[in-house]
Amino acid sequence: MKNINPTQTSAWQALQKHYDEMKDVTIAELFANDSDRFAKFSATFDDLMLVDFSKNRITEETLAKLQDLAKETDLAGAIKSMFSGEKINRTEDRAVLHVALRNRSNTPIIVDGKDVMPEVNAVLEKMKTFSQAIISGQWKGYTGKAITDVVNIGIGGSDLGPFMVTEALRPYKNHLTMHFVSNVDGTHIAEVLKKVNPETTLFLVASKTFTTQETMTNAHSARDWFLKTAGDEKHVAKHFAALSTNAKAVGEFGIDTANMFEFWDWVGGRYSLWSAIGLSIILSVGFDNFVELLSGAHAMDKHFSTTPAEKNLPILLALIGIWYNNFFGAETEAILPYDQYMHRFAAYFQQGNMESNGKYVDRNGNAVDYQTGPIIWGEPGTNGQHAFYQLIHQGTKMVPCDFIAPAITHNPLSDHHQKLLSNFFAQTEALAFGKSREVVEQEYRDQGKDPAQLEHVVPFKVFEGNRPTNSILLREITPFSLGALIALYEHKIFTQGAILNIFTFDQWGVELGKQLANRILPELGDDKAISSHDSSTNGLINRYKAWRA
């Protein structure tokens, strides 16, 4: 990957001038001037997904200039570098190959002179065999009963991805009940343990090193709880499995290393649901559906790596995001799925985007003088409409939004889905076109009211519009289409990081707090007053000690 400051390119300078021409142009004007706008600014993927980006403050000239930026920063070279196994995570000297985990073509992918695909396929086969034994009831707990509940213990990528996918694919789930524990707050594990039976529960401990503080604290608490009933430590092997690479620590915990599922340094945590970390997904929806999830992602990988940039969906969405973040000053993006099963999707890509591109140092080690990753947030529709859409419609901040919905619901209950989708379509129309003062006044006349007598209310009912959105309409949310959608967002994030000259696949920002917590933890072991920190931290610790005494 080349290290090119995007602001030093001629394309960036051209975009700055273009912004000066575009900043006062409205979406309404763009539609009024082009009856073919939807056709020009939308695209489909495999007849499974329609991406409509026409309700954005862009023209064909805007996209051409953004594509020039991608060319000048050598995005094409960056894509080739990732897919070929080059160590593009330079701060950790690692390749970035989550695409290998879903490489259904089995084309060799080489890291350090070695094809990784045989190992990937071997772990998949091992997961298949294990999951089939659990799901079928062939695997028995220590009292001879089949497993009924699975508790995934992890944090970050070892939790957010599997939790999001198992929720999104709940219509495909089997008889096993899934639980997810992540927070080191004892309340999280305590509440889950109240719901399960030690005789019929399987714990998955997801930690590559088997040293992650939160995960191992929860795992040891789960083990202690289990042994209070089971008694004999040899029974741990029937109720615990590990998603890890530390065989020694796994064995010492009491887990049979035959039930340890490995993954590799070239798998980043927030891109790991495709790996052994996805075992909870397999146990929830079955191996065949997991393969469909992989296949959908692989199809998007092929689209991303082979489709010209002008028609490449992840690239188009990434470029539009850069346009708003760096030229319009938009600091956030909202992800708004109109599907209740997708209620964790925004939270998942909150980590995916903010941990990847929340960087202020470029690939040369210099502080940047431009915007990098946006703040990501969102909730399912229509809940959000009754919570934060007010600010999106009439606030002072630009919030570009992605609206996501399936055309076909898994629950065709009465006219629920038509009502849901009517809101999905209405919101992007309202955000784009708004409501003028003239329309508000005419509405009052139509009601037999005199607008002049309601002058004190009229301004508050005006919507400026011109709020940008993308609409992603899926035929249906299936394992395949979900895999493709997740990969679409992954590659959007990669594209933005590549163009913005930052390292997308490390996360040093999580380290400092961990280090300080490890220093503070021993200080909490007694009731002595602390004076080793700043006055604020000292004051907080000392009040905590006084109150707990």
UniProtKB/Swiss-Prot annotation:
Keywords: Cytoplasm, Gluconeogenesis, Glycolysis, Isomerase
Enzyme class, UniProt record, top EC level: isomerase
Keyword Cytoplasm: yes
Protein's pathway: Carbohydrate biosynthesis; gluconeogenesis; Carbohydrate degradation; glycolysis; D-glyceraldehyde 3-phosphate and glycerone phosphate from D-glucose: step 2/4
Localization (cell): Cytoplasm
One of the GO biological process terms: glycolytic process
One MF annotation (Gene Ontology) recorded for this entry: glucose-6-phosphate isomerase activity
Reaction it catalyzes: alpha-D-glucose 6-phosphate = beta-D-fructose 6-phosphate
Gene Ontology cellular-component terms listed: cytosol
Active site (catalytic residues): 355 (proton donor), 386, 514
A Pfam family annotated for this UniProt entry: PGI
The EC number(s) this enzyme carries: 5.3.1.9
Record's function text: Catalyzes the reversible isomerization of glucose-6-phosphate to fructose-6-phosphate.
Family as reported in the entry's similarity comment: Belongs to the GPI family.
Name used for this protein in its record: Glucose-6-phosphate isomerase
